[in-house]
Amino acid sequence: NDDIKIRSSDQRLPLRGVEIETKEFLKCGQVFNQDGLTVTSFETDHGEKIKPNWGYKIQYLGRTVVISGDSKNDFRVSEIAKNSDLLFHSLGAAKDEIKNLDDINAILQHHTTPKEAAKIFSSSRPKLAVIIHMVLLGKPGFPPMTTMEILETIQTYYNGPLTIAEDLMKFEVGEKVKVMPKANT
């Protein structure tokens, strides 16, 4: 498309850097298997009208990474992620004063709360739990929860290793899981 051509030209980058091959699938199961790396999709609950919705289990050389996908409280994730090396989980949150307002509650019904995420982490016991895709809701006079408030809420119910993902953060999965924050540019 023209946008890609312009960006490639402006930045003097080869077009092959943006080539991508997609493969659509309509049911859960193994979606990739090459050289010992397997990716298996599984269905997750993101609400009655948001289907299908997928999570992913990635396995390689005895290591396991699970991505919940954008989901509400779904304990299938906990079972699939049992004793994984790394569990990425989405989250939605609002302060107590506004979480039951109709518009806020409607959005939260499609997401896992911090307390629910803590229960999933406690049950699955990953080497590292990582919060991704945070839907943080607020209203005038009621700002969204801060990342510190999110961490404190989760740590009230879960005492394992935990971090909140940032763009360009890297993870090294081995005997231990190492977090490498994005490089300062």
Where are the predicted features?
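Cap/insert and terminal regions of metallo-dependent hydrolase folds
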Residues: 55, 64, 72-169
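A polyampholytic, Gly/Pro-enriched intrinsically disordered region
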Residues: 180-185
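Generic secondary-structure boundary signal with a strong preference for alpha-helix termini
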Residues: 81, 178-179
